[in-house]
From Swiss-Prot:
<keyword id="KW-0592">Phosphate transport</keyword>
<keyword id="KW-0472">Membrane</keyword>
<dbReference type="GO" id="GO:0005524">
    <property type="term" value="F:ATP binding"/>
</dbReference>
<protein>
    <recommendedName>
        <fullName>Phosphate import ATP-binding protein PstB</fullName>
        <ecNumber>7.3.2.1</ecNumber>
    </recommendedName>
</protein>
<dbReference type="InterPro" id="IPR017871">
    <property type="entry name" value="ABC_transporter-like_CS"/>
</dbReference>
<comment type="function">
    <text>Part of the ABC transporter complex PstSACB involved in phosphate import. Responsible for energy coupling to the transport system.</text>
</comment>
<dbReference type="GO" id="GO:0005886">
    <property type="term" value="C:plasma membrane"/>
</dbReference>
<dbReference type="Pfam" id="PF00005">
    <property type="entry name" value="ABC_tran"/>
</dbReference>
<feature type="binding site">
    <location>
        <begin position="68"/>
        <end position="75"/>
    </location>
    <ligand>
        <name>ATP</name>
    </ligand>
</feature>
<dbReference type="InterPro" id="IPR005670">
    <property type="entry name" value="PstB-like"/>
</dbReference>
<dbReference type="InterPro" id="IPR027417">
    <property type="entry name" value="P-loop_NTPase"/>
</dbReference>
<keyword id="KW-0813">Transport</keyword>
<keyword id="KW-0997">Cell inner membrane</keyword>
<dbReference type="InterPro" id="IPR003593">
    <property type="entry name" value="AAA+_ATPase"/>
</dbReference>
<feature type="region of interest" description="Disordered">
    <location>
        <begin position="1"/>
        <end position="26"/>
    </location>
</feature>
<dbReference type="GO" id="GO:0015415">
    <property type="term" value="F:ATPase-coupled phosphate ion transmembrane transporter activity"/>
</dbReference>
<dbReference type="GO" id="GO:0035435">
    <property type="term" value="P:phosphate ion transmembrane transport"/>
</dbReference>
């Protein structure tokens, strides 16, 4: 397993140096290291401007929640972080979007490598029509040079990390589509982390799940922040307050306010933020 961990660690350390982690979230708030830097960012779909001159720093190894009413630009921004909007013909952007020293928007950026470094978990679980094992092994087979034994170890490690190993260990070669919704979503998280990403993007990861599965995913998100930088879009105010370290509130394509989650929810600086978190609109 040492060789396997070294292989994954080497990939995760590309373009940045290892940084000691704080012992507690409170310490991390003092001088958080920036993982994602967004400056003067604008985005369009055709002639419609979805994001207006947005600037935001996303700290490393924390959970940052994007909140705001539908159409406010939060999912658009999330999808630009790993260039998912490249597949939208009318999508265009301008500004600065950096992950460490990587210029995400540069035409020379290797998008395949970018999406390995920046994993994505979608609103609806989307396992491949393959076995549970093959879902997790798919990415590593493309990006890593592993023996079968190392691949087996990585699949187990990823499923354990995603808190689903005990539920699937005796049926790894069964169809992934036979899992429950909550299990499928945790499988998708395992699939995302199997290639050693630095960042995990989550777009409404619990909206299609029952309360018990939602709680399991929320607990998992909070644990994963120790190793990954997580950016989560959610319409669920309680969820944002429970499992994020920082919150950014968007309205009509603009960033209204961002800061420690407790501050945004209990002592917001902007009236629109206060109205939104209190449920006066949305």
């Amino acid at each position: 397993m040492k060789a396997l961990n070294a292989n994954i660690s080497t990939m995760s350390e590309v373009s940045r140096s290892a940084t000691p982690q704080s012992d507690s979230p409170a310490q991390a708030e003092v001088t958080p290291e920036v993982c994602i830097r967004i400056a003067n960012f604008n985005a369009w779909y055709g002639s419609f401007q979805a994001i207006h001159n947005l600037s935001l720093d996303v700290p490393r190894n924390q959970v940052t929640a994007f909140i705001g009413p539908s159409g406010c630009g939060k999912s658009t921004l999330l999808r630009w972080i790993n260039r998912m909007n490249d597949i939208v013909p009318s999508a265009n952007s301008r500004g600065t979007l950096m992950i460490d020293e990587l210029d995400v928007l540069a035409q020379t950026t290797d998008v395949v490598n970018l999406r390995r470094r920046v994993g994505m978990v979608f609103q609806k679980p989307n396992p491949f029509p393959k076995s549970i094992y093959d879902n997790v092994a798919f990415g590593p087979k493309l990006h890593l040079y592993l023996s079968r034994a190392e691949l087996d170890e990585l699949v187990e490690w990823s499923l354990r990390k995603a808190a689903v190993w005990d539920e699937v260990k005796d049926r790894l070669h069964a169809p992934a589509l036979g899992l429950s919704g909550g299990q499928q979503q945790r499988l998708c998280i395992a699939r995302a982390i199997a290639v050693g990403p630095e960042v995990l993007l989550m777009d409404e990861p619990c909206s299609a799940l029952d309360p018990a599965s939602t709680l399991a995913i929320e607990d998992l998100i909070y644990e994963l922040r120790e190793q990954y930088t997580i950016v989560m879009v959610t319409h669920n105010m309680q969820q944002a307050s429970r499992c994020s370290d920082r919150t950014a509130f968007f309205f009509e394509g603009k960033l209204v306010e961002s800061g420690p989650t407790q501050d945004v929810f209990t002592k917001p600086q902007e009236k629109r933020t206060d109205d939104y978190v209190r449920g006066r609109f949305g």
